[in-house]
UniProtKB/Swiss-Prot annotation:
Residues 606-609 are annotated as: G4. Residues 34-404 are annotated as: Disordered. The keyword Cell inner membrane does not apply. It comes from the Bacteria. It is found in: Cytoplasm. This is Translation initiation factor IF-2. It comes from Synechocystis sp. (strain ATCC 27184 / PCC 6803 / Kazusa). The gene is infB.
Length: 1001
């Protein structure tokens, strides 16, 4: 021992003693040592060595020898002895069933409570162990497997047995003599027989397992258990060993190793394996003689048990830190092995020791018994449940498959673009099937990619599912009924809402100005209307003042949505047609909007004061569109007017009022307001502003309103003449302030009495709108990732980034719709931002980062925006007429196109002579047309065959080099790469020029 500190287990190896013996000596010498891994000083080690010389010859050698015959591990020895003692007691109690093995050991155990008698039974028990050890030693795993298998099949009986088994330990505790202890556990008679036979085989296989199990239970065991283990080891050797057992108090230190064995036997008893009983009994009877064989090989195994003990002690320390429950499943198997080993050990001594610790085994045995039984059951249940669950899951999957096949729809409705996942859900098939089907057709898609209606239809039809497309609802169709059943009792007449529609420059706004006696048209940029105007007019009719609300819609083709929106909310439509221009495309569109909205139509033939006016031609053209004038036998009212001179305006107003009376226009003013957004914009000083048309109810300042997905509380209302009003009745249009955001034109609004409900409704709608926008954005992308990469490699991918700011929401939608109509095959338009309001510095920053141009329509620049744009080099274009805006954007797109290289002919010449010069030849030519220019391209033709294409390297007239030769002159043409000139050849001179391409080409 050269080290300053010496470990207990090193000392035990040096002295050839067991760790527990060294610990006993330490305790007697008052040396502080808790476990085999504890360290002591060299002086203490010398004291222990001196004491060990007196102490060791009896205890350490004998327990080791005993452990060797019973099991190859020392740990198994004490376990076997204790178990044997307990099992013998059980054998006595349970003698009737296993009569053969039990009677011989019983008298020996009872009479010699002293250690001497236990030795003969040990020999008998060990004999059967020898047979099993010899046979299963070769097939150790097999011997282990059979006990575990029987445990699994009878989980229920095992549950019943454990409760009875914990009870028996109590009676042995009460009895002081070892014999009564044997009588105590009678219910375990079956298990002792089993354990006695398998004990020899299991110690070999389970030694490592027993170690781990001991470690787990050794932590919870009490010092009494250690005493029992020591007692077990002593009885097997001669009587002096029993005398050594007297120092039981010091043995509590051995608890770490020994108590584990004691705990396991009760647990195993509780488990009791019925299947092993009969076989074990037979083995015991037949194999009593081979015990000496087992004892003989034990001496060479001395080294191994020490190592095993050390390992067990180390594992025990680790087990203390770990959770006991985790290793309990292993303990179940080890418990059975321990029971088997215990049958062979000296039962009387074990019984006496176990009696001293009865209360602890109860709690310990009771607690582990339940988990052990449960653990035995759990694997079986899990395996059974797993198989059953697997079968059930498979059956469920089969059912699902069957259901899917059965539920596969025969017809589906496609009204929009769908993602692959949505289409799969609709068709009740797997997404991978759709992806495979498209891949086979040469279309590579992802599960989240959006498919257009045509592709979705193709996929559905390929799966033999019919596709139906719902009827398209016209944009002008009225989809919402503003009147409720509750309004029927409070209905009153309301003014008619009249929408003026027609082709651009046919005089719509001028007609309205004449009626209102205002000058609106003069204020319009370019003299054309570019957003809806709402005005109310008071008219004298039948000695009463009647009110009419007019909506003026744009006539330009870009404002189709505005015209549809106007027709949707109108009661009467006035179609203005210029008498000198006739029916135009927007005239036809206005007629279709009026028919879709189902509103009566009045035709105002304008500009009848012009000399070239021809009202009859207008009536003829309208009749071809299904509008037959009343004077021609039809039902369409046609009124000739002159907006500029005010001719026959009264007749037009009278017809409007007559039609409104026939239509019976009513509303309930005594309810919360409902209506439609005519226009919306972002004002730099007032914030979001919306023009609302009240179609039912009364709108008041302070109302909580939800416009589409926008919530707001009305702060102010302004009528068409700029005056503030406190309330607005049905059919009136007002501007409101106080919205949280700019709503979309055409959205319907509703007033709520509770602000909380209004906010919740707005949030829900905002979420729906967001999903719709995302889907539209995905479906509207004309460039996919695959096409982008392909075009980028070919240098064909070009994009024009635009930031669009407009005065009102309606104009914004019109411009975006017009941009979509532009050809975008080679140049894509990317609208990074489109919003109403003025151009801000934030817009400039976005444009600078993305290389976009800013387009402002009827809007202004915020303070600092112009300076920021100049600093960042951002181009800001301002427009007030949509024609110019669209033309400039188209020009910008064409500017991104690569110019086209075309061939431009210069002239032709005929070869009339060939002159050899040096190594080559010179063609003497006569210029027939155009001119020949040096360093331009030429093409040599001989008959219908092209012989050569190259450059004109030299051009001479007479002997002087010239740059060009005009028609009618002779010249010499030389080409370094062509000398095969012949008279009669035709030389064509041309050059390649770059021409700007257009979007159409």
């Amino acid at each position: 021992m050269n080290n300053a500190k010496v470990r207990i287990y090193d000392l035990s190896k040096e002295l050839n003693l067991e760790n527990r013996d060294i610990l006993d000596i330490c305790e007697r010498l008052n040396v502080a040592a808790k476990s085999h891994s504890s360290t002591i000083s060299e002086s203490d080690a010398e004291r222990i060595k001196a004491a060990a010389e007196k102490f060791t010859p009896q205890q350490p050698k004998k327990p080791r020898v005993a452990s060797r015959p019973e099991s190859k591990e020392d740990k198994s020895d004490p376990k076997q002895q204790k178990i044997l003692a307990i099992h013998h007691k059980q054998e006595k109690s349970g003698g009737p069933s296993p009569a053969r093995p039990t009677p011989p050991p019983r008298p020996k155990l009872q009479a010699p409570k002293a250690p001497t008698p236990p030795q003969p039974p040990v020999a008998k028990a060990s004999a059967p162990k020898i047979q099993k050890q010899e046979e299963p030693a070769q097939e150790a795993p097999k011997s282990v497997a059979p006990p575990t298998q029987p445990l699994a099949p009878p989980p229920v009986p095992s549950l019943q047995s454990p409760p009875s088994k914990p009870a028996p330990p109590t009676p042995p505790a009460k009895k002081a003599a070892p014999a009564p202890r044997l009588a105590g556990p009678p219910g375990r008679t079956a298990s002792p027989n089993k354990t006695a036979v398998p004990a020899p085989a299991k110690p070999k296989v389970n030694r490592p397992e027993i170690v781990s199990l001991k470690d787990n239970r050794g932590q919870a065991r009490s010092p009494g258990d250690r005493e029992e283990k020591v007692a077990i080891a002593a009885p097997e050797p001669p009587k002096p060993k029993v005398e050594l057992r007297r120092p039981k108090p010091p043995r509590p230190e051995e608890d770490e190793n020994l108590p584990e064995l004691l705990e396991f036997p009760p647990l195993s008893r509780g488990k009791g394996v019925d299947g092993d009983n009969d076989a074990d009994d037979g083995d015991l009877l037949s194999t009593e003689k081979p015990k000496p064989k087992l004892k003989r090989p034990t001496p060479p195994r001395l080294g191994k048990p020490d190592q095993w003990e050390d390992d067990e002690d180390e594992k025990a320390n680790k087990a203390k830190a770990a959770n006991k429950g985790k290793r309990r499943p292993k303990m179940d198997d080890d418990d059975d092995d321990l029971d088997i080993d215990g049958d062979n050990g000296p039962k009387p001594t074990l019984v006496s020791l176990s009696i001293a610790r009865p209360p602890k085994p109860k709690s310990l045995a009771a607690k582990p018994s339940t988990p052990t039984v449960a653990k035995v059951k759990k694997p079986t249940l899990k395996s059974e449940a797993g198989s059953s669950a697997g079968g059930s899951s498979r059956s469920r999957g089969d059912r699902r498959d069957r259901k899917e096949v059965v539920q596969k729809p025969e017809v589906i409705m496609l009204d929009r673009s769908l993602t692959v996942r949505d289409l799969a859900d609709l068709l009740k098939i797997s997404e991978t099937d759709i992806i495979k089907r498209l891949f086979l057709k040469g279309v590579a898609v992802q599960i989240t990619q959006t498919l257009d209606e045509e592709t979705a239809r193709m996929v559905a039809e390929s799966f033999e599912v019919a596709v139906e497309t719902p009827e398209r609802v016209a944009a002008a169709a009225k989809t919402t009924e503003m009147l409720d059943e509750a309004d029927l009792d409070n209905l009153v007449r309301r003014p008619p809402v009249v929408t003026i529609m027609g082709h651009v420059d046919h005089g719509k706004t001028t007609l309205l100005d004449s009626i209102r006696k205002t000058k609106v048209a003069q204020g319009e940029a370019g003299g054309i209307t570019q957003h809806i105007g709402a005005y109310h007019v008071e008219v004298e009719h039948n000695d009463k003042t009647e009110q009419i609300v007019f909506l003026d819609t744009p006539g330009h083709e870009a404002f189709t949505a505005m015209r549809a929106r106007g027709a949707k909310v109108t009661d009467i439509a006035i179609l203005v047609v210029a008498a000198d221009d006739g029916v135009q495309p927007q005239t036809k569109e206005a007629i279709s909007h009026a028919k879709a909205a189902g509103v009566p139509l009045i035709v105002a033939i304008n500009k009848v004061d012009k000399p070239e006016a021809n009202p009859d031609r207008i009536k003829q053209e309208l009749s071809e569109l299904g509008l037959l004038a009343e004077e021609w036998g039809g039902d369409t009212i046609m009124v000739p007017v002159s907006a500029l001179n005010g001719d026959n305006l009264d007749g037009l107003l009278e017809m409007i009022l007559l039609v409104s009376e026939v239509e019976e226009l009513v509303a309930n003013p005594n309810r919360q307001a409902k209506g439609t957004v005519i226009e919306a914009n972002l004002d730099r000083t007032r914030g979001p502003v919306a023009t609302l048309l009240i179609q039912n109810g009364t709108l008041r300042v302070g109302d909580a309103i939800v416009v589409g997905a926008v919530y707001g509380k009305i702060r102010a209302m302004i009528d068409d003449r700029g005056d503030k009003v406190e309330e607005a009745s049905p059919s009136f249009a007002v501007e409101i302030l106080g919205l949280g955001d700019v709503p979309a034109a055409g959205d319907e609004f509703e007033v709520f009495t509770n602000e909380k409900d209004a906010r919740l409704q707005a949030e829900a709608r905002a979420m729906e709108d967001r999903q719709t926008r995302l889907q539209q954005a995905m479906s509207s992308r004309k460039v996919t990732l695959s096409s982008i990469s392909a075009q980028a490699q070919e240098g064909e991918l070009k994009e024009l980034n635009i930031i669009l700011k407009a005065d009102v929401q309606g104009s914004l939608g019109a411009i975006l719709g017009s941009l979509e109509q532009l050809p975008q095959g080679e140049v894509q338009i990317r609208v990074l931002l489109a919003s109403p309001g003025e151009v801000t510095e934030t817009d400039v920053d976005l444009a600078a980062a993305s290389g976009a141009i800013i387009i402002g329509f009827n809007t202004t620049l915020a303070s600092g925006a112009r300076q920021a744009a100049d600093q960042e080099g951002v181009d800001i274009r301002e427009y007030d007429i949509i024609y110019k805006l669209l033309d400039d954007i188209q020009g910008a797109m064409e500017g991104l196109l690569d110019p086209e290289e075309i061939e431009s002919s210069l002239g032709t010449a005929e070869v009339r002579a060939v002159f050899p010069v040096g190594r080559g030849n010179i063609a003497g030519c006569y210029v027939q047309s155009g001119k020949i220019i040096r360093n331009r391209n030429l093409r040599v033709r001989r008959g219908d065959q092209v012989l050569f294409e190259g450059n004109i390297d030299s051009l001479k007239r007479i002997k002087e080099d010239v740059r060009e030769v005009n028609a009618g002159y002779e010249c010499g043409i030389g080409c370094s790469k062509f000398n095969d000139w012949k008279e009669g050849d035709i030389i064509e001179a041309y050059e390649m020029t770059m021409k700007r391409r257009t979007l159409a080409t």
